[in-house]
């Protein structure tokens, strides 16, 4: 598949960045079969099947074992990541927040699987082909949202605030935002713009959850690219070519946590390494992807000035 990033590129769930959303759903499907204590996503496997990539379907449904393709660490990280964001949303909405925004929602099914409080509105933003596919597929499965689900079919590089408002979003009300697994697929300046816009659209007492990846030390990114290329080679041997190293943006960028803190967000966080330990999962070993130092951060906006 063609996957090199360029300005204005688009995708579906079988190509480019969209394929990474499908691969993440594969990991959630495998994790759900292995350990419903941390994650229970009954829609992951059916959504992957509907995308139509045979290898990913067989992995998601258990017809092919993950050994050698989906490493155990990816499955374990899928478990703790899902749990972190699930708990974030439920805690936020149980405080009275009734607006939820999921940026780059991909195959996320939280609008269908979480026990949202009555009156919660969940806004999902993603490329038009992605949100149309998920809406159509889940409707065909007979799935019913557990919240008032609204979609904004828009590229996050375009005027997504206008699309969000058109769907009914009210920036005067507190909101719970997530940018899950998104920021590494944005250029550094686009990441800043996204976080600035989230802040501008956030009333006091809004909440946010995302990831903070430390800036690389010399040699870190070369090792990361080599590791991603090794992973892609394993997939190519099975006639699936995600070309993962070419989908991300590299180089230094503003780290998420201090950037948001400077804009009035009070944040806490926990590293992937500590989350794995907290849930009794095996530690990371050869961490060429630098996952262990990624911190999942969440917090509240209490200030109205930058």
From Swiss-Prot:
Keyword terms, alphabetized: Methyltransferase, S-adenosyl-L-methionine, Transferase
EC number(s) per entry: 2.1.1.-
Pfam families named in the record: LCM
Region (Disordered): 201-225
Regions annotated as coiled coil: none
Residue positions binding S-adenosyl-L-methionine: 126, 155-156
GO biological process: methylation
SUPFAM superfamilies in the record: S-adenosyl-L-methionine-dependent methyltransferases
Molecular functions per Gene Ontology: methyltransferase activity
Record-stated family: Belongs to the UPF0677 family.
Its job: Exhibits S-adenosyl-L-methionine-dependent methyltransferase activity.
Name of the protein in question: Putative S-adenosyl-L-methionine-dependent methyltransferase FRAAL5401
UniProt source species: Frankia alni (strain DSM 45986 / CECT 9034 / ACN14a)
């Amino acid at each position: 598949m063609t996957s090199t990033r360029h300005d204005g590129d688009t995708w579906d769930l079988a190509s480019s960045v969209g394929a990474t959303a499908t691969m993440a759903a594969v990991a959630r499907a495998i994790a759900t079969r292995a350990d419903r204590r941390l994650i229970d996503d009954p829609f992951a496997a059916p959504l992957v099947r509907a995308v139509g990539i045979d290898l990913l379907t067989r992995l998601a449904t258990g017809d092919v074992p993950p050994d050698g393709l989906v490493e155990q660490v990816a499955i374990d990280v899928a478990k703790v990541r899902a749990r972190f964001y699930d708990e974030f949303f439920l805690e936020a909405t149980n405080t009275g927040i009734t607006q939820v925004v999921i940026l780059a929602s991909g195959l996320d099914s939280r609008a269908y699987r979480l026990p949202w409080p009555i009156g919660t509105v969940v806004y999902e933003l993603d490329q038009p082909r992605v949100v149309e596919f998920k809406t159509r597929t889940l409707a065909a499965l007979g799935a019913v949202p557990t919240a008032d689900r609204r979609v904004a079919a828009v590229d996050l590089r375009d005027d997504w605030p206008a699309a969000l408002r058109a769907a009914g979003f009210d920036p005067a009300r507190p909101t719970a935002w997530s940018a899950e697994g998104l920021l590494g697929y944005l250029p550094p300046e686009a990441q800043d713009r996204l976080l600035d816009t989230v802040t501008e659209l956030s009333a006091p007492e809004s909440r946010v959850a995302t990831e903070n990846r430390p800036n690389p030390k010399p040699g870190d990114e070369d090792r990361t690219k080599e590791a991603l290329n090794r992973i892609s080679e394993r997939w190519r041997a099975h006639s699936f070519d995600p070309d993962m190293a070419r989908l991300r943006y590299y180089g230094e960028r503003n780290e998420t946590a201090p950037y948001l803190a400077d804009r009035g967000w009070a944040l806490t966080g926990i590293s992937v390494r500590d989350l794995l330990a907290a849930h009794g999962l095996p530690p990371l070993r050869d961490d060429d992807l630098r996952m262990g130092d990624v911190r999942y951060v969440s917090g509240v906006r209490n200030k109205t000035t930058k």
